[in-house]
C-alpha cells in the first residue's frame, strides 16, 4: 500500500489490555476499533502461550488486528453498498452465537459465524479471514459452502459459494479502486510474516 497509505490510515493509537472482555451474551470480545484512529487489542497476557500456534495466533490476535483495521478503513472511506445486498436478509444480530447459527453458515454465504451479526462485521470478517488464510484454507471454507444431495453430489445451485465469492470480489475491488491495494499481495505478505512469527524467525529491523 505504501508509506502514504500507512501514514494516513494506520491507527495512531494501539491500546493493549491484558485480559479478554466478555459481552452480556457471554461472547468473548477480542478487540475494538474506535473513531478511525484507535485499536484496542485484548488478551495480550496470553500472547506468549499462543504465539507459536498458528490457529490460536490467527483467531485471537492477527485476524482481530486485521478485522479492526478494516473497520478503521471503512470509517474513513465507506465500502460499496452493494456488499450488503449479497445476503441482505440473513443477518441475525447477536443470535449469531446461538447453536442455530453456529454451523452451516458457509452454505448461507458467510465465512465465519460472526459474519452473520451484521453487514459491517461481515465485510471485516471477509477481508480479515481472506488475508490470513492460505489458498488451501480459503478453499476449505468454500468447500464447506457446497450444498450436497443425499447421495453426496453437489447441487446445481450453490448460493453459499456464489455469495462468498461475490463478497470477496466486492472487497478486492473496493481496496483496489479506493486505495490501490491488491488483497492477494497483502495476503502473501501477511502469511509470510506469520510464518516467521510462528517459527520464531522474525526480524523487526527488516520489514521490506
State what each model feature region is.
Residues 1-17:
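Zn2+-dependent metallopeptidase catalytic core
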Residues 16-208:
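Active-site-flanking segments in enzyme catalytic domains
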